[in-house]
A protein has these predicted regions:
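Core, soluble structural subunits of large cytosolic macromolecular machines
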Residues: 1-150
Length: 150
């Protein structure tokens, strides 16, 4: 009808866009993406992480995004199965853009050896107001800075 204002549809999510896709399409929802609000971000420094090292972070810090340079296929398959069967708010991405993700989320990369030893201080986790990843891109909406910190 004339004079009726229509809402503007946003074609891209808000936040910083990076060329990072999902580590496995099984993490995606029916729309082909993961959309997590108030996500915790675990940046893993190194490769070779196993499910044993990931069980505590996954159980304690949901929703959780795992960010690593590489991850074994069996680990990814188990993560996808947990996401689907237990409806866990969980995603994994494989990327070399570790410093960029750490900077945007405030994460401190954690070594596989530290995870193996059970060492994961809460302050090492990054955070995002919203984390959206599809097959090829990620949008990270950082948490607003705390009042009084500059």
């Amino acid at each position: 009808a004339p004079g009726v204002r229509r809402p503007v549809l946003r074609t891209e999510p808000r936040g910083e866009r990076l060329e990072i896709g999902l580590a496995d399409p099984g993490f995606a929802d029916v729309n082909g993406r993961v959309d997590l609000k108030d996500a915790n971000v675990l940046v893993i420094d190194g490769t070779g992480v196993t499910m044993r090292e990931l069980m505590i972070p996954i159980s304690r810090h949901q929703p959780l995004v795992l960010v690593a340079r590489g991850m074994d296929e069996d680990v990814l398959a188990t993560l996808v199965a947990n996401r689907k069967s237990l409806t866990m708010p969980l995603a994994a991405v494989i990327t070399d853009l570790i410093p960029e993700v750490a900077d945007l989320t405030g994460a401190l990369p954690v070594s596989v050896a530290d995870l193996r030893a059970g060492y994961l201080p809460a302050g090492h986790l990054g955070h995002a107001t919203r984390w959206i990843t599809d097959g090829a891109r990620t949008w990270i909406e950082p948490h607003p800075p705390l009042v009084g910190t500059t």
